[in-house]
A protein has these predicted regions:
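Conserved catalytic core of the tyrosine transesterase superfamily
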Residues: 1-292
Protein backbone atom coordinates (compact mmCIF):
# COMPACT_ATOMS: atom_id res chain seq x y z
CA UNK A 1 0.00 0.00 0.00
CA UNK A 2 1.24 3.47 -0.87
CA UNK A 3 2.17 5.29 2.36
CA UNK A 4 0.57 8.57 1.29
CA UNK A 5 -2.79 6.93 0.54
CA UNK A 6 -2.59 4.93 3.77
CA UNK A 7 -2.16 8.09 5.84
CA UNK A 8 -4.92 9.91 3.93
CA UNK A 9 -7.29 6.99 4.55
CA UNK A 10 -6.31 6.94 8.22
CA UNK A 11 -7.03 10.65 8.50
CA UNK A 12 -10.50 10.09 7.03
CA UNK A 13 -11.00 7.26 9.52
CA UNK A 14 -10.10 9.54 12.44
CA UNK A 15 -12.41 12.27 11.14
CA UNK A 16 -15.27 9.77 11.03
CA UNK A 17 -14.52 9.03 14.69
CA UNK A 18 -15.00 12.76 15.33
CA UNK A 19 -11.43 13.38 16.46
CA UNK A 20 -10.64 17.03 17.07
CA UNK A 21 -8.61 19.13 14.62
CA UNK A 22 -5.85 19.30 17.24
CA UNK A 23 -5.68 15.49 17.44
CA UNK A 24 -5.68 15.11 13.66
CA UNK A 25 -2.88 17.65 13.29
CA UNK A 26 -0.74 15.93 15.92
CA UNK A 27 -1.30 12.44 14.49
CA UNK A 28 -0.47 13.52 10.95
CA UNK A 29 2.65 15.38 12.09
CA UNK A 30 3.86 12.33 14.03
CA UNK A 31 3.32 9.95 11.12
CA UNK A 32 5.14 12.31 8.74
CA UNK A 33 8.16 12.43 11.04
CA UNK A 34 8.08 8.67 11.55
CA UNK A 35 7.90 7.89 7.82
CA UNK A 36 10.80 10.23 7.06
CA UNK A 37 12.86 8.67 9.85
CA UNK A 38 12.41 4.98 8.97
CA UNK A 39 12.40 5.57 5.18
CA UNK A 40 11.00 2.12 4.26
CA UNK A 41 7.59 0.88 3.07
CA UNK A 42 5.10 0.63 5.94
CA UNK A 43 4.97 -3.18 5.78
CA UNK A 44 8.74 -3.35 6.31
CA UNK A 45 8.82 -1.33 9.52
CA UNK A 46 10.29 -3.42 12.36
CA UNK A 47 10.38 -3.21 16.15
CA UNK A 48 14.00 -2.08 15.96
CA UNK A 49 13.06 0.80 13.67
CA UNK A 50 10.46 1.98 16.19
CA UNK A 51 13.08 1.82 18.95
CA UNK A 52 15.48 3.76 16.74
CA UNK A 53 12.80 6.41 16.23
CA UNK A 54 12.36 6.61 20.01
CA UNK A 55 16.11 7.11 20.40
CA UNK A 56 15.89 9.90 17.84
CA UNK A 57 13.17 11.61 19.89
CA UNK A 58 15.16 11.16 23.10
CA UNK A 59 18.18 12.74 21.41
CA UNK A 60 15.95 15.74 20.68
CA UNK A 61 15.29 15.86 24.45
CA UNK A 62 11.57 15.40 24.13
CA UNK A 63 9.77 14.56 27.35
CA UNK A 64 8.74 10.93 27.97
CA UNK A 65 5.07 11.95 27.97
CA UNK A 66 5.50 13.52 24.50
CA UNK A 67 7.32 10.45 23.18
CA UNK A 68 4.50 8.23 24.45
CA UNK A 69 2.06 10.39 22.48
CA UNK A 70 4.16 9.74 19.37
CA UNK A 71 4.06 5.99 20.07
CA UNK A 72 0.28 6.06 20.54
CA UNK A 73 -0.11 7.78 17.17
CA UNK A 74 2.02 5.14 15.41
CA UNK A 75 0.32 2.31 17.31
CA UNK A 76 -3.10 3.62 16.31
CA UNK A 77 -2.04 3.87 12.67
CA UNK A 78 -0.92 0.23 12.53
CA UNK A 79 -4.01 -0.96 14.38
CA UNK A 80 -6.06 0.80 11.72
CA UNK A 81 -4.06 -0.84 8.90
CA UNK A 82 -4.41 -4.32 10.39
CA UNK A 83 -8.00 -4.19 11.66
CA UNK A 84 -9.72 -1.84 9.20
CA UNK A 85 -7.71 -2.24 5.99
CA UNK A 86 -6.87 -5.92 6.60
CA UNK A 87 -3.32 -5.01 5.64
CA UNK A 88 -0.93 -8.00 5.88
CA UNK A 89 1.71 -6.62 8.24
CA UNK A 90 2.90 -7.25 11.77
CA UNK A 91 2.46 -4.62 14.48
CA UNK A 92 5.84 -2.93 15.08
CA UNK A 93 4.90 -1.14 18.32
CA UNK A 94 4.96 -3.31 21.41
CA UNK A 95 2.96 -2.32 24.48
CA UNK A 96 6.05 -2.32 26.68
CA UNK A 97 7.69 0.45 24.66
CA UNK A 98 5.97 3.29 26.49
CA UNK A 99 8.33 5.28 28.69
CA UNK A 100 7.75 5.65 32.40
CA UNK A 101 7.45 9.18 33.70
CA UNK A 102 6.47 10.91 36.90
CA UNK A 103 3.15 12.71 36.98
CA UNK A 104 3.43 15.92 39.01
CA UNK A 105 0.47 16.49 41.28
CA UNK A 106 -1.92 19.25 40.22
CA UNK A 107 -0.87 22.64 41.59
CA UNK A 108 -3.47 25.01 42.92
CA UNK A 109 -3.74 28.47 44.45
CA UNK A 110 -4.04 28.79 48.21
CA UNK A 111 -7.17 30.54 49.44
CA UNK A 112 -5.25 33.70 50.35
CA UNK A 113 -3.64 33.88 46.88
CA UNK A 114 -6.94 34.00 44.96
CA UNK A 115 -7.87 37.58 45.99
CA UNK A 116 -4.21 38.53 45.70
CA UNK A 117 -4.37 37.63 42.00
CA UNK A 118 -7.79 39.08 41.19
CA UNK A 119 -7.09 42.34 43.00
CA UNK A 120 -4.52 43.25 40.33
CA UNK A 121 -6.85 42.45 37.40
CA UNK A 122 -8.63 45.63 36.37
CA UNK A 123 -9.84 44.60 32.89
CA UNK A 124 -13.45 43.39 32.94
CA UNK A 125 -12.69 41.01 30.09
CA UNK A 126 -9.71 39.46 31.86
CA UNK A 127 -11.54 39.15 35.17
CA UNK A 128 -14.35 37.31 33.38
CA UNK A 129 -11.98 34.98 31.51
CA UNK A 130 -10.07 33.96 34.61
CA UNK A 131 -13.17 33.73 36.79
CA UNK A 132 -14.62 31.16 34.36
CA UNK A 133 -11.48 29.09 34.85
CA UNK A 134 -11.59 29.43 38.63
CA UNK A 135 -15.31 28.88 39.22
CA UNK A 136 -16.35 26.77 36.21
CA UNK A 137 -13.13 24.83 35.64
CA UNK A 138 -12.84 25.87 31.99
CA UNK A 139 -9.62 25.13 30.14
CA UNK A 140 -7.89 28.07 28.49
CA UNK A 141 -8.82 26.65 25.05
CA UNK A 142 -12.46 26.45 26.11
CA UNK A 143 -12.46 30.08 27.27
CA UNK A 144 -10.94 31.15 23.95
CA UNK A 145 -13.57 29.23 21.94
CA UNK A 146 -16.56 30.17 24.11
CA UNK A 147 -19.37 31.62 21.99
CA UNK A 148 -22.24 33.95 22.81
CA UNK A 149 -24.67 31.17 21.86
CA UNK A 150 -23.17 28.94 24.58
CA UNK A 151 -24.21 31.33 27.36
CA UNK A 152 -27.44 30.56 29.20
CA UNK A 153 -27.53 33.42 31.68
CA UNK A 154 -31.18 32.96 32.80
CA UNK A 155 -30.17 29.52 34.12
CA UNK A 156 -26.72 30.66 35.28
CA UNK A 157 -24.99 28.07 33.13
CA UNK A 158 -23.00 27.75 29.96
CA UNK A 159 -22.35 24.99 27.45
CA UNK A 160 -18.87 23.79 26.60
CA UNK A 161 -18.97 22.26 23.13
CA UNK A 162 -16.27 19.86 21.98
CA UNK A 163 -14.00 20.23 24.97
CA UNK A 164 -10.92 18.05 25.31
CA UNK A 165 -11.65 14.64 23.83
CA UNK A 166 -14.53 16.20 21.86
CA UNK A 167 -16.69 16.02 24.97
CA UNK A 168 -19.62 18.40 25.49
CA UNK A 169 -20.68 19.41 28.99
CA UNK A 170 -22.67 21.93 31.00
CA UNK A 171 -21.01 24.05 33.70
CA UNK A 172 -22.64 26.36 36.19
CA UNK A 173 -21.96 29.97 37.09
CA UNK A 174 -21.37 30.85 40.73
CA UNK A 175 -22.80 34.17 41.91
CA UNK A 176 -19.47 35.97 41.60
CA UNK A 177 -18.71 34.43 38.19
CA UNK A 178 -22.18 35.42 36.94
CA UNK A 179 -21.76 38.98 38.17
CA UNK A 180 -18.30 39.44 36.64
CA UNK A 181 -19.34 37.87 33.33
CA UNK A 182 -22.40 40.15 33.06
CA UNK A 183 -20.23 43.19 33.83
CA UNK A 184 -17.97 42.26 30.93
CA UNK A 185 -20.84 41.57 28.53
CA UNK A 186 -22.30 45.01 29.23
CA UNK A 187 -18.94 46.62 28.46
CA UNK A 188 -18.19 44.32 25.50
CA UNK A 189 -18.03 46.31 22.25
CA UNK A 190 -20.85 45.70 19.80
CA UNK A 191 -19.57 43.04 17.43
CA UNK A 192 -20.76 40.41 14.98
CA UNK A 193 -18.10 38.06 16.33
CA UNK A 194 -19.50 34.82 17.71
CA UNK A 195 -16.78 34.44 20.33
CA UNK A 196 -17.36 35.96 23.76
CA UNK A 197 -13.88 37.29 24.45
CA UNK A 198 -12.38 39.75 21.98
CA UNK A 199 -9.08 41.57 21.55
CA UNK A 200 -9.50 45.10 22.89
CA UNK A 201 -6.52 46.99 21.44
CA UNK A 202 -4.23 47.13 18.42
CA UNK A 203 -4.60 46.13 14.80
CA UNK A 204 -6.62 43.00 15.66
CA UNK A 205 -9.11 44.85 17.86
CA UNK A 206 -12.50 43.14 17.77
CA UNK A 207 -11.07 39.76 16.74
CA UNK A 208 -11.41 36.75 19.08
CA UNK A 209 -8.61 36.48 21.61
CA UNK A 210 -6.51 33.34 21.15
CA UNK A 211 -5.06 30.94 23.72
CA UNK A 212 -1.62 32.50 23.67
CA UNK A 213 -3.11 35.94 24.23
CA UNK A 214 -4.98 34.71 27.32
CA UNK A 215 -1.83 33.05 28.65
CA UNK A 216 0.12 36.27 28.16
CA UNK A 217 -2.47 38.16 30.20
CA UNK A 218 -2.15 35.63 33.02
CA UNK A 219 1.65 35.93 32.98
CA UNK A 220 1.28 39.71 33.16
CA UNK A 221 -1.00 39.65 36.21
CA UNK A 222 0.93 36.87 37.94
CA UNK A 223 4.08 38.95 37.73
CA UNK A 224 2.33 42.00 39.20
CA UNK A 225 0.85 39.91 42.03
CA UNK A 226 4.17 38.18 42.69
CA UNK A 227 2.68 34.74 42.15
CA UNK A 228 3.64 31.69 40.12
CA UNK A 229 0.35 30.78 38.51
CA UNK A 230 -0.89 29.53 35.15
CA UNK A 231 -4.33 29.43 33.58
CA UNK A 232 -4.57 25.70 34.18
CA UNK A 233 -3.85 26.17 37.88
CA UNK A 234 -7.13 28.05 38.21
CA UNK A 235 -8.90 24.93 36.96
CA UNK A 236 -6.93 22.82 39.45
CA UNK A 237 -7.88 25.28 42.18
CA UNK A 238 -11.57 24.90 41.41
CA UNK A 239 -11.33 21.10 41.63
CA UNK A 240 -9.40 21.17 44.90
CA UNK A 241 -11.77 23.70 46.48
CA UNK A 242 -14.80 21.59 45.55
CA UNK A 243 -13.17 18.46 46.95
CA UNK A 244 -12.34 20.26 50.21
CA UNK A 245 -15.99 21.32 50.38
CA UNK A 246 -17.00 17.62 50.22
CA UNK A 247 -18.23 17.66 46.62
CA UNK A 248 -18.68 14.20 45.13
CA UNK A 249 -15.77 13.03 42.97
CA UNK A 250 -18.09 12.06 40.10
CA UNK A 251 -19.62 15.55 40.18
CA UNK A 252 -16.17 17.11 39.91
CA UNK A 253 -15.35 14.73 37.05
CA UNK A 254 -18.44 15.88 35.13
CA UNK A 255 -17.76 19.57 35.74
CA UNK A 256 -14.15 19.27 34.59
CA UNK A 257 -15.02 17.11 31.60
CA UNK A 258 -12.64 14.30 32.54
CA UNK A 259 -13.17 11.11 30.57
CA UNK A 260 -11.65 8.91 33.28
CA UNK A 261 -12.32 9.12 37.01
CA UNK A 262 -8.62 8.32 37.59
CA UNK A 263 -7.73 11.76 36.25
CA UNK A 264 -10.03 13.39 38.79
CA UNK A 265 -8.78 11.16 41.63
CA UNK A 266 -5.37 12.80 41.40
CA UNK A 267 -6.88 15.82 43.14
CA UNK A 268 -7.48 13.66 46.20
CA UNK A 269 -3.71 13.49 46.68
CA UNK A 270 -3.40 17.27 47.03
CA UNK A 271 -6.51 17.91 49.11
CA UNK A 272 -4.78 17.96 52.49
CA UNK A 273 -7.55 19.93 54.17
CA UNK A 274 -10.09 17.20 53.47
CA UNK A 275 -7.66 14.51 54.66
CA UNK A 276 -7.12 16.39 57.93
CA UNK A 277 -10.84 16.92 58.44
CA UNK A 278 -11.72 13.29 57.71
CA UNK A 279 -8.95 12.11 60.03
CA UNK A 280 -10.09 14.23 62.98
CA UNK A 281 -13.73 13.21 62.49
CA UNK A 282 -12.79 9.54 62.44
CA UNK A 283 -10.33 9.68 65.33
CA UNK A 284 -12.86 11.53 67.51
CA UNK A 285 -15.33 8.69 66.94
CA UNK A 286 -12.64 6.18 67.90
CA UNK A 287 -11.78 8.11 71.07
CA UNK A 288 -15.46 8.43 71.99
CA UNK A 289 -15.96 4.68 71.51
CA UNK A 290 -13.01 3.98 73.81
CA UNK A 291 -14.21 6.47 76.40
CA UNK A 292 -11.21 8.80 75.98
Amino acid sequence: MDITNAIINYRRFLKRKNCSKHTLRNYMSTLKQFVLCVDVPIEQVTHKMVLSFMDHLLDKRLKPKTINCYLNSIRGFYEYLIEEEQFPTSHPVKRGYSLRFSRPLPRYLRDEDVPRLFNVISSKRDRAMFMLMLRCGLRVEEVSKLTMAALDLPRSQLFVYEGKGVKDRVVYLSNDAYKILVQYLKARPSSRAKRVFLIEKGRFKGKPIQVRGIQHRMQHYAQIAGLKVSCHQLRHTMATQLLNADADLVTIQDLLGHTRIKTTQRYCQVSNLKVQRDYHKAIERVMHRHGL
